[in-house]
């Protein structure tokens, strides 16, 4: 660690003098670590990079832990301040009307090779909590764990692995934060009926053939299934927390039944029925109002906010393909069906030919053609929002 500031200062000075990076490194070893062989020099540089990487992780955890202290979460520009401003101006009804046709769509697109692997993300989360609690013993242990944990995988991740890494953000960041935003809006807006579609999450990994040519149909289906399973796990955890508070006779048993239903679906022992799940939660809400003076209804409403946001799909898989590949596929299909290329829109819409599923023998073409059909398969399990953009 003591050589890092020395190396940093040395590099800055030599770069200012016009030396090349290769010259700078060679001169540094001559002046400060003379006598080391090439392998020892490589080991030293590797440890420098390793040390700096972990410093960056520590800074990330520190920033997360101190965010609420460094930023006024209720100040100017925040959602709560905006809603107060709307209320004071008497514009809540107008805002409600505008939100009927307004939605934002955050799309997770970046390849997770740019992010930390899941085990490092878990350490950052625990380290952040320990810093917030000022638990020095835990901080020290997590830093030791971080020092022994590789930050990058030695083997290239599969498209499914990449999707799993990004799903971590859905599960641990977006599920909570998007739900909190919706709950804040619900508490502030008049005549809220739970149907506003304020936030729609998009998801490219597993469906993006343009960005990752190794994506195939089985990957798309796997990712869609994983999105649904992880979402059900989030619902299950929320239900367990609900049951700790809502311990009243009758309603407690209702929550137990819902929890068992979700758990069976997670284990693939029972088919997921969103309508049944949604209705059961509303029954719990109604019983709390009618039989228990509305105690803890806010907790149920917060879960219903998330159910309205994420449904059965969590995020919509965007099926993407290079337009040239799509043209190749349709040219091959037209040739297979014996259809001439339409010259006018009228001729195009008048076509009655239908693909019977016969494959061409070209993997890319067949995958492109079958990707249109897989959308319906995903929609049948994850509702239409599960995959509705090509």
State where each predicted segment sits.
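Often metal-dependent polyanion-binding catalytic scaffolds in large enzymes
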Residues: 1-349, 360-367, 386-389
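Core AdoMet radical
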Residues: 356-357
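Well-ordered, non-membrane alpha-helical segments in soluble/globular domains
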Residues: 368-375
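Acidic (Asp/Glu)-rich catalytic clusters
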Residues: 375-383
